[in-house]
Amino acid sequence: MNSLRPELLELTPQALTALSNAGFVKRSLKELENGNVPEISHENDALIATFSDGVRTQLANGQALKEAQCSCGANGMCRHRVMLVLSYQRLCATTQSTEKEEEWDPAIWLEELATLPDATRKRAQALVAKGITIELFCAPGEIPSARLPMSDVRFYSRSSIRFARCDCIEGTLCEHVVLAVQAFVEAKAQQAEFNHLIWQMRSEHVTSSDDPFASEEGNACRQYVQQLSQTLWLGGISQPLIHYEAAFNRALQAAETCNWRWVSESLRQLRASVDAFHARASHYNAGECLHQLAALNSRLNCAQEMARRDSIGEVPPVPWRTVVGSGIAGEAKLDHLRLVSLGMRCWQDIEHYGLRIWFTDPDTGSILHLSRSWPRSEQENSPAATRRLFSFQAGALAGGQIVSQAAKRSADGELLLATRNRLSSVVPLSPDAWQMLSAPLRQPGIVALREYLRQRPPACIRPLNQVDNLFILPVAECISLGWDSSRQTLDAQVISGEGEDNVLTLSLPASASAPYAVERMAALLQQTDDPVCLVSGFVSFVEGQLTLEPRVMMTKTRAWALDAETTPVAPLPSASVLPVPSTAHQLLIRCQALLIQLLHNGWRYQEQSAIGQA
């Protein structure tokens, strides 16, 4: 029996959840525990499960789970298909010993992939011609996976390609699966054993000696970006928009002509920050704007260096096409999505107010966001957290899990849902939902997070398809809590994870668009009957401290989306809990403040004073 369908033995509950849904898996496990075990047989290379109520499910050799035939009459996936796999696994576990895991060889699938429709293979080769790069993960004991610029592929079975899942609209046996297999085969030929690798696909159109700025378009893009940077530094972003509007447009048009997605997205992010500054938006962050401008120029400089190393036969840490995002599509259609909320941020400016909710797909680990805005005149009667999105209140979405059909994802990670694409269900967020998530999103503690941040590449070469400073951390104990009225910020220090120096700083600034968020945070950290055990939020360095700005706080019974709080909670404890920065950090803080001052007001108008302060 074990040799008949070995690929089914590899399907973990997590894999079955990804191939069907969590409800089917939970119900199937419960029914099996209650004794509703089907009779397993096989005939003509097909595995058959016969249930006590007469339902008969048949899974032929070479079929995917959703292709199985079932007499229950359900369209698509059903619990009987899941129970067939689980029952078969239990039967094999009792009749045969577990064989030692063999080394994975994806090359066995090349012959089968060659029989796919011509259209699928042509789409795959078109992506190869653009010089696509694929991030490969193949750690022992973990599911092999491939992260493409706009799709994620996971190989839930090392024996059958039919159980590979992609989060694109096709779901399986698509061009992304083809490319993932090809990348693994090529990478293993060069380096037999690896846990993590970035692999660039090459064709006759992509040579190792090409230069991103050798073409007229590439050189023009670099020049226009440099001109924009010089304009902003000399005049400052506080100057009227008309002074740099043309420079932004020239640089953006040049980046789009080159089809360098991360360069164009960098320009859009920078422009959004500049617009937020002029609109006096609550979510404007001066340090982030400074970082965006610096990273924009650094991205092009890094691309030049990666190309230079490649041209002399040296393997670059990251291919230059990955640095600039060459050939990445602006949108991608997604398959059936199950999303878990990571939190919400409300904002307002002089004309609009709105919100952004972040979700993660537990099957792939990718992060998406949903954004909406409305005229400021409607805010008093309809606060952002109470607005309805697709018939559900925003606060419920921020503290829940959702299922969506036929969605799209933009290049910057935005979840695009048309009005007709209703969310089919929303259930409250639970600690179990977050426990299913893995690294790097969910970290075991602040010590592990520091190490991860030290080892990852610089921001100027990382892709911009999703936020990469959003994490989930454990909370064991709150050791100090206080409201700093001078900074209008609630600070706390908590124990997070094991090891030395495991104190995590939580800081949440007050916001007029979410006035009771700080009160809810203070109340949660002080309660003892249902203490906070997990927290999600954005990580940054504040006055030399690795600091997390909380978005959701999870107790043992429920999740609290802080910005969804719409009523007063409790008074704030007044205290200063943050340590005094060291002399070195104080100098760095002054340096950053001076750079921000120059960025706001321009070098041209404060050259002498800036030199004196420096």
Curated annotation (Swiss-Prot):
It comes from Escherichia coli (strain K12). A zinc finger (SWIM-type) spans 55-89, 151-185. GO terms for cellular component: cytosol. InterPro entries: Znf_SWIM. Missing up to 60 C-terminal residues compared to orthologs. The gene is yehQ. The keyword Flavoprotein does not apply. GO terms for molecular function: zinc ion binding. This is Protein YehQ. Keywords: Metal-binding, Repeat, Zinc, Zinc-finger.
